[in-house]
C-alpha cells in the first residue's frame, strides 16, 4: 500500500455535509484495508481565485495509506460528487502524522490573538496600581 495526501474542496453551500462526506471516504479507505494517518478539517476559507463563480470553499485534508483500487474509487467519488469543486492527490514516501503547516499557522494566530487580548486587562489593573503609587510619591514632595 502507498501513502497519499488528499485535499478536497467542498462547495460552501454544502459545508454542513462535510462530516458525512469525510465519514464515507474514510470508511471506503478502511474497508479496503487502508489507514487514515491524519485528518484535518481546515474549515471554510477564501479561494485564491474563483471556481465557477464560487469565492470560498470548505477545505479537508487526509493523509492515508491505501491501495490503488481504493484511491481510484475515492477519485471517482470526488468526480461524481457535485459538492466537491476541486481535489488534489499527492503520493508521499511515508505516512505524515504531525500537524500540517496550515493548522499550525491557525493555532499560532489564535494564540497570538489570545495573548493580545489578555494583556489589555492585566495592564489596566497594573496600570492603576502604578498610577496610585506615582500619585502618592508626588504627594510626599
Swiss-Prot record:
Pfam families: Ribosomal_S6. Residues 103-124 have a biased composition (Basic and acidic residues). Residues 125-141 have a biased composition (Acidic residues). One of its GO terms (cellular component) is cytosolic small ribosomal subunit. GO terms for molecular function: small ribosomal subunit rRNA binding; structural constituent of ribosome. The keyword RNA-binding applies. InterPro entries: Ribosomal_bS6, Ribosomal_bS6_CS, Ribosomal_bS6_sf, Ribosomal_S6_plastid/chlpt, Transl_elong_EF1B/ribsomal_bS6. Keywords: Ribonucleoprotein, Ribosomal protein, RNA-binding, rRNA-binding. Residues 97-141 are annotated as: Disordered. GO terms for biological process: translation. Belongs to the bacterial ribosomal protein bS6 family. Binds together with bS18 to 16S ribosomal RNA. This is Small ribosomal subunit protein bS6. The gene is rpsF.
Amino acid at each position: 500500500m502507498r501513502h497519499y495526501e488528499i485535499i478536497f474542496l467542498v462547495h460552501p453551500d454544502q459545508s454542513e455535509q462535510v462530516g458525512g462526506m469525510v465519514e464515507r471516504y474514510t470508511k471506503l479507505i478502511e474497508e479496503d484495508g487502508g489507514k487514515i494517518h491524519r485528518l484535518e478539517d481546515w474549515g471554510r476559507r477564501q479561494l485564491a481565485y474563483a471556481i465557477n463563480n464560487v469565492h470560498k470553499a470548505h477545505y479537508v485534508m487526509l493523509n492515508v495509506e491505501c491501495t490503488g483500487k481504493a484511491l481510484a474509487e475515492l477519485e471517482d467519488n470526488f468526480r461524481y460528487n457535485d459538492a466537491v469543486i476541486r481535489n488534489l492527490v499527492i503520493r508521499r514516501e511515508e505516512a505524515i502524522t504531525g500537524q500540517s503547516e496550515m493548522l499550525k499557522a491557525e493555532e499560532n494566530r489564535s494564540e497570538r490573538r489570545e495573548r493580545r487580548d489578555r494583556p489589555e486587562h492585566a495592564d489596566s489593573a497594573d496600570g492603576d496600581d502604578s498610577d496610585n503609587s506615582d500619585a502618592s510619591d508626588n504627594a510626599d514632595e
